[in-house]
Amino acid sequence: MKIAVLSRNSRLYSTRRLMEAAQSRGHQIRVVDPLRCYMNIATSNPEIHYKGQKLEAFDAVIPRIGASITFYGTAVLRQFEMLGTYPLNESQGISRSRDKLRSMQLLSREGVGMPATGFAHSPDDTDDLMQLVGGSPVVIKLLEGTQGIGVVLAETRKAASSVIQALRGLKAHFLVQEFIEEAGGADIRCLVVGGKVVAAMKRQGKEGEFRSNLHRGGSASLVRITPKERATAVKAAKVLGLNVCGVDILRANSGPVIMEVNSSPGLEGIETATGKDVAGMIIEFIERNRKPGKTGTKGRRG
């Protein structure tokens, strides 16, 4: 197969591992910077051009699109879909996962466990919003934040009101969620490939830090997940329409609750913690499932 990896940096661990896994199985693989792609949309024969030349045809495309380039990156991916290239994750699924509010609405509708979550516009509704999620302490989360950036723990109602007021002044959109204290600053990252959890790790925030992201100094270790946690991760991936994703789960007293679904999960932490060849599993999934033009969207739906 000829495989394209949409990535801005070929030296990143995840990109390198995917290339190694594909090449070891005899596939041709090329890293394509999505921001250097430009598209011919007006004709009946859609094209993608790259650094001054028409891009050759690929059998499959692996999107490793950073959150900061979601809009343009998914536009490029849609163009690949229109050309009949098999996408590991479709543009629609990535767009859903990157919209924290939309993804929470979809997960809630399908009965997936999640923390009490509120969203409001008017400052007059702040007190009621706090009550909706059970009162302080609360977690206030920017909709466009990643890797723990833009996430604040407000331990009192006064602190929460101050943070909310400041964010409204910046015209920022945010969610207010209940704080799952019993999680103890830890979460479970489940790596889903093709409707199965193929690896899982526990991420523990450093002392005094409620965020468990490895980018925030957290540590990772192998963990045994429960059948309910496994089912929750698989269902979340299915609801958002993702073949491959990282599902972040908190262990609440009420059971597993979803914090986030990452459509471009990093591989370094989970491969190191579990010793599993996740990159190889991803390439094997493409081998089993790739068919020309096999995409639910074909670029037609947003």
From Swiss-Prot:
ATP binds at residues 141, 178-179, 187, 211-213. Keywords: ATP-binding, Ligase, Magnesium, Manganese, Metal-binding, Nucleotide-binding, Protein biosynthesis. It is an enzyme of class 6 (ligase). Mg(2+) 1 binds at residues 248, 260. Its cofactor is Mg(2+); Mn(2+). One of its GO terms (cellular component) is cytoplasm. It holds the Pfam family RimK. Mn(2+) 2 binds at residues 260, 262. One of its GO terms (biological process) is SOS response. Mg(2+) 2 binds at residues 260, 262. Binds 2 magnesium or manganese ions per subunit. It comes from the Bacteria. Mn(2+) 1 binds at residues 248, 260. Residues 104-287 form the ATP-grasp domain. Its EC number is 6.3.2.-. One of its GO terms (molecular function) is ATP binding. HAMAP family: RimK. PANTHER family: RIBOSOMAL PROTEIN BS6--L-GLUTAMATE LIGASE, RIBOSOMAL PROTEIN S6 MODIFICATION PROTEIN. Belongs to the RimK family. This is Probable alpha-L-glutamate ligase. The lineage of its organism: Bacteria, Pseudomonadati, Pseudomonadota, Gammaproteobacteria, Chromatiales. The gene is rimK.
